[in-house]
């Protein structure tokens, strides 16, 4: 890895080597395309419910199970990435979620769709720990915060891409025959598999992981159970605050986005093309906000770069969710996203900096995706209160978003400051497990 200092006259984008750029691009591709495959489902839940004749809450259960299965995929992939390297699990995960989405698009029954999307969750969860470790270990220290924001914010680009596809392709596909609108959206999700060819040819393992693995082999010491290691006393508080942070993070995200399309269509009477506007531009702004606040973390620290935008964003929630005029809704919602869009900026960077190399992928994968399990409850709960309790979606979405943001800010405040931390190949966890 480059050791260029923060005061170097070399521009930050010239500091990384070609191999470091390739590693980062691989992680970026995996995450952005992962986002497309997952988020497109949020836009087509209503027509799926109509085609299979099931209540909307049962379709949201598909979304819930997909999120829960992410934890299984992340835990397995993290273990593989720490043992075998970051690259192979990344390729496996991309192939997995791509072909599961294809299978979902060809579903003959709702049960088949349910199973295909549940399996997709495994591949989706498996992508993040391998990709995040690959990117953050490869990247130079001085711009890691900014590039963490670019990487995680690219989920917004994937979501924007799915919104764009929905806005332009759903109607023409549906005109080919009833049901081909939502099926076509899912079938498009097989295209990310092509990225694996590029990763296989051009991407190398991070030097810090390679060196760490050599030391483990030389000393004949390995962390056999990395998931248990992160709950040892040395890392317990770190793991607890990280889990709380990610649980709140996922709840915020799905309180905002999970039922937004359904809310706009069913309660405000928007067309699919109209719904695509806030989804598309909101996610473009999410990418920009994530990149901006990630860059700010190099100046004001990791914690403040997350707490400030999220605390400010709370003020906008009751305003946009009590606005029915399309123009005002769009304006206030976009302003809200400028701040709340920064909440994910440091997911790859801060989680990677909190743990040593031997367990980094396992730790980051588990801490991040256990949050998805909590987030999985959001859509069914919102639907229950909106439909079964006749509250409509606006109030449940507002309460869930504000409450989760408050917990988010507290969790970040309790976490460690890691700005400028250098990732090394030293054996840290093994020294705890096997006393000298």
Locate the predicted segments by residue.
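Central cavity-lining transmembrane alpha-helices of secondary-active solute carriers
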Residues: 64-77, 280-292
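Conserved MFS/SLC helix-loop-helix module at the cytosolic interface between two early adjacent transmembrane helices
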Residues: 72-108, 300
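Cytoplasmic helix-loop-helix junction between adjacent transmembrane helices
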Residues: 116-153
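Extracytoplasmic gate region of multi-pass secondary transporters
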Residues: 42, 235-287, 375, 379
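Glycine-rich segments within core transmembrane alpha-helices of 12-TM secondary carriers
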Residues: 145-170, 367-379
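Cytosolic juxtamembrane N-terminal segment immediately preceding the first transmembrane helix
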Residues: 1-36, 41
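C-terminal transmembrane helical hairpin of 12-TM major facilitator-type secondary transporters
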Residues: 303-347
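Helix-breaking motifs and short loop linkers at transmembrane-helix boundaries and internal kinks
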Residues: 53, 85, 106-112, 140, ...
